[in-house]
Amino acid sequence: MKVRAVVLERIGEISLRDIEVPGTLEPSDNEVRIAVKTVGVCGSDVHYYKHGRIGDFIVKEPMILGHEAAGVVTAVGAHVADLKIGDRVCMEPGVPDFASRQTLEGHYNLDPSVRFWATPPIHGCLTPEVVHPAALTYKLPDNVSFAEGAMVEPLAIGVYAAFKGAIRPGDVAVVAGAGTIGMMVAFAALASGCAKVILSDVAKAKLDLVADHPGVVTVDLNREKLADVVAALTAGHGADLFFEASGSPHAFDDMMDVVGRGGRVVLVGMPQDRVPLDVVALEVKEISVIGIFRYANVWERTLALLGSGKIDVKPLISASYPFDQSVAAFERAAQQNSSDVKIQITF
């Protein structure tokens, strides 16, 4: 079938056109059809646009972009009981093999055969309608807009990172990187019980967006040394947690100086190349290192946090473009303006 979509043709070229895709818009027994209303432009979309690959995921043929989405249910399969036509929803973009070992053990994000929107060779959701498993489609709280619903996907990464970090009430956390994911991690850490989150970056404009947020201390790495700020704020003990959300190899330079004894490091960002790690310091200080990949089993909790008002993502939405201006939206996102956090596309 042919659909109208935002298509990555090749490195540096995006178009809005009709494209032939497999499948049908008629949902099977356990699926729903959704009219897409809002889609966020993710850093991974931009990376594919600029570089054509992320690690082993290589764009070899035209691919529809987009995986952060919210919309309205327009049809339901015969066995779907929890959703109905007209429901406002957001969609978890990774569809695992529901019978795989990883899925059955509760780690469906690690299923090697997961089909994740806009990850080659799987098409994304920047198209007017999609069909998706009902089990991975979630109702939006009444007070959560489509724009906020399209932010659930990146926020879920933050919530999952906070969960894996085993936050204790009163913890002090460092978050390296004030991009979309870093800010989501910071908000989730505070909502999970951290007394203070120290957010560092080289982009002052991004730090300024959250400088007045209760519990957040910002560190401009162009002007201050992170280790000095952490030492001053923790009486020299160091941070309980360090969330690496920048993907920058420089974040590892003084990581072990920043984390306190018995602390935890949660790796969220993905460096392009291998990075050195001070293993001796890690052992002497008994620092635990935890890696995370996307998320699992946190979408309902993420929506509950949004609906409760404990986390407000609206200030992070920098601009919205109509679907027919999608190419312009990607061109802006690719510029990586220091004051932009999230660009969205609306239908």
Where are these regions (language model features)?
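Residue-level recognition of short, solvent-exposed, well-ordered loop/turn junctions
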Residues: P27-S28, K84, R168, G260, ...
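NAD(P)H dinucleotide-binding glycine-rich loop of Rossmann-like/cofactor-binding domains
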Residues: V95-A176
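C-terminal hydrophobic helical "lid"/dimerization subdomain
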Residues: M1-A5, D253-D257, A296, E300-F347
